[in-house]
């Protein structure tokens, strides 16, 4: 049980860190009324692990803070990502093509109101729903599905793998058909 908790927290932390880095690196595209937040492609990850739900939420929270977002954006933008991640996880048994839908809808319904009432953007809310929606479709549906199929193909190779570390810090990796042993580190 303890190893499962550690694994869960490690996965969540790694996902949060990747989300923050992608948001920060692509900051010019990640904020505003017309945005394509590349890190939102990670909202496909709850299909693979429930640890992605808190990971994406914390990553979005930290990414918004580091990106200089205002408090309503930090709170409600992160909640939109949390809602999207949760419902992506709930849809994990359905078609993979449905997985990007929850974060797209959550952001379309929440972010335009943050832009209007938090940032004072004078554009009509339906227009901002369209611009945010287009950005989310690019991030979640297009890039997210690319990530999904890349991970799905990789998962096949590592599904039957085992990793062990010996006393001499030699890493042994047992794949389904192959064996790899790293050189001795110490």
How would you describe each model-predicted region?
Residues 1-47, 51-54:
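Hydrophobic transmembrane alpha-helices
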Residues 167-168, 172-180:
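Intrinsic-disorder-associated, low-complexity terminal segments enriched in Asp/Asn/His/Tyr and depleted
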Residues 18-24, 56-64, 112:
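Membrane-embedded alpha-helical segments in integral membrane proteins
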Residues 28-33, 41, 61-76, 80-86, ...:
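Membrane-embedded alpha-helical hairpins and interfacial helices in multi-pass inner-membrane proteins
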Residues 181-185:
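Short, intrinsically disordered C-terminal tails of secreted or membrane-associated proteins
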